[in-house]
Amino acid sequence: MASPATSSAVLVVVLVATLAAGGANAATFTITNRCSFTVWPAATPVGGGVQLSPGQTWTINVPAGTSSGRVWGRTGCSFDGSGRGSCATGDCAGALSCTLSGQKPLTLAEFTIGGSQDFYDLSVIDGYNVAMSFSCSSGVTVTCRDSRCPDAYLFPEDNTKTHACSGNSNYQVVFCP
């Protein structure tokens, strides 16, 4: 039989592990710019947006409880020190850190996470602005290099473009793969 001290220590370890799991991330998104030009990726509802020079990577830790979101690249952007400005494509109300979806045209990575299975896709329904690939750690890579992209949603009822992967997967978005 365990001593009271041992039982208390085990209980503390279990409580700490439970609390740590409650604050865990639902997924990690690694976004890389392989283009020869700067891309300003945006992510909603988490992440916001940043400037990525060629070769740079941005990592987003999506918190548990997030059920879906979008990632896209913006091009031709100019922002001031307060994060206000504009982009030629994918602009989100003139903000560097997006809280709204981007404006057409934009190549869009979409995800639904949580539970035992996640879903993800690329879409060019709202236009095409930059080549992109999107993959999860346990699924296939979907790639879009032009506006006639066979791996992406081309119209809303195009229900053959969604891909599944096991829950708790991590994701990679690459611009100009």
Curated annotation (Swiss-Prot):
Cross-referenced SUPFAM superfamilies: Osmotin, thaumatin-like protein
GO biological process: defense response
Domain of life where this protein originates: Eukaryota
TM spans (from-to): none
CDD domains referenced in this protein's UniProt entry, alphabetically: TLP-P
Induction: By pathogen infection.
One GO CC term, this protein: extracellular region
UniProt keyword terms in alphabetical order: Secreted, Signal
Entry's localization field: Secreted
InterPro entries from the UniProt entry: Osmotin/thaumatin-like_sf (IPR037176), Thaumatin (IPR001938), Thaumatin_CS (IPR017949)
Signal sequence coordinates: 1-26
PANTHER family cross-referenced by the UniProt entry: OS03G0233200 PROTEIN
Family (UniProt): Belongs to the thaumatin family.
Protein name as annotated: Thaumatin-like protein
Organism: Oryza sativa subsp. japonica (Rice)
